[in-house]
Amino acid sequence: MKTSEFKTDIFNLFDQKWAVLTADTPDRWNAMTISWGSMGTIWGYPQNGRPIVTVYVDPLRYTYEVLNQSDSFTVSFFPEERRKDLIMMGSRSGRNGDRLKGSGLTPVNNHGFVTYKEAELTFECRKLFQQTLDNVTPHFKVPGYRRYAANWSSEN
């Protein structure tokens, strides 16, 4: 789908839907639920910006390790009736076992990107930039901030 055909309110996707971030390739991948992220454009003139997705991942998460070694990731959004499956994905670590098992989600390889048959919307992203958030302004920092001190921006 072309970005000009996209009719979803991107400002509410992360707030109102549950999402799964999936990193790496179908041979070696891991997924986690996410609720912090944003979408927009960068490096372009009006009508010609590069679409990006930015996600924030706790450095203690196993997906953080996998994402560090990957040049791509997907962000998949699911309908409300899949919330129970996503709770399963968000409650276990991929480091210690298969969190997909028992979730009811079906992974699909889409040209080297892992998505899910049950997803209603998936962004396939190539990593463009990553950094820790150590230098954010003091008013941004909230209790528990240190745990959420990394992010990735990508071109999709």
Label every PLM stretch briefly.
Residues 1-156:
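Basic, polyanion-binding surface patches
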